[in-house]
Amino acid sequence: MEEVVITSAIRTPIGGFQGELDCFSASDLGGMAIDGAMKQAGIDRVDEVIMGIVLGAGQGQAPARQASFAAGLDETIPATTLNKMCGSGMKAAMIGFDQIKLGQSKILAVGGMESMSNAPYLLPKMRGGARLGHGKVIDHMFHDGLEDAYEPGRLMGTFAEDCAEKYQFTREAQDEYALKSLENSLSAQKSKVFENEIMPIETVDRKGKKRTIVLDEQPQNAQPEKIPNLKPAFRKDGTVTPANSSSISDGGAALILSSRVYSEKMGLPIRARILTHSSYAQAPGLFTTAPIYAVQKLLKSLSWTADMVDLWEVNEAFAVVPMALSLIHI
């Protein structure tokens, strides 16, 4: 089977909620990332575009195809949109890996995109008409993104609270993790660590002034001195706060994946190779610890041990997620 490599990797800056990037749709942001990744790779065509998105309501048909067109790709290139919640972009990369590994594709654009700022409100039961009484308005972001589908109205952050309680992660420990993460982000911005992976975005601010955005928005606006005093976000006496949870954000990211044989034949850059991937599922309310078992499954498939890996990148949806993963010495 084919060896799969990463040819290029580009993302937009990450915008805050109703912040610098709220004038762009998710497909706009995805298109920018795809365009940047293709330019970085030095190509003008791929076999297919695969993009993940969670909040698709109001986006119009086939958001991935819209992103493909926004990137200037030809209309003969297929595009696939998928939704796997927070793992949507990663799943797009996994599917792309499988297609190339099996020889079904030679080169693909894969990634994820989201504009939480533009998530619409929904009007249930309006299709048949509201005959009498008050109607109801539902927040698409909450209903389809931040709330549990099996316990309607229950925010996913309450499951983070359950995790903190089970593993005795204190408020102080979570805040310390959040502060360290913020410190790392600001340090990376200052030293321009992410400069080569961020595609600058041209926009016009609310005062009509043209701006070029090159930095992630939220770390710059954070006020670390206030973090210890923030109120819990999900339970009155809880430990999970807005600071030790992830931000509501906008952005897009894309990879160009190809087979090693194709990359070498076409003289394309090879930045890394992908060996394999794994998925793991358990009860939805236990999502905070699912990465532990996905990692163990992955290591077993490679006959590796955790100490053979130099760097782990873990989704920080809540501080308790990487903190839980550290329990297996990662």
Per-region residue spans from a language model:
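Beta-strand segments within the central parallel beta-sheet cores of soluble alpha/beta enzyme folds
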Residues: 6, 45-52, 79-81, 108-113, ...
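Conserved small/polar residues in nucleotide/adenosyl-binding loops
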Residues: 328-330
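Flexible glycine-/small-residue-enriched beta->alpha junction loops
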Residues: 107-162
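Active-site-proximal alpha-helical scaffold in enzymes
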Residues: 82-114, 164-193, 254-261, 326
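Active-site pocket-shaping loop/turn-to-helix segments
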Residues: 12-38, 55-57, 80-94, 106, ...
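Conserved active-site "lid/cap" helical segment
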Residues: 1-59, 63-71, 78, 162-171, ...
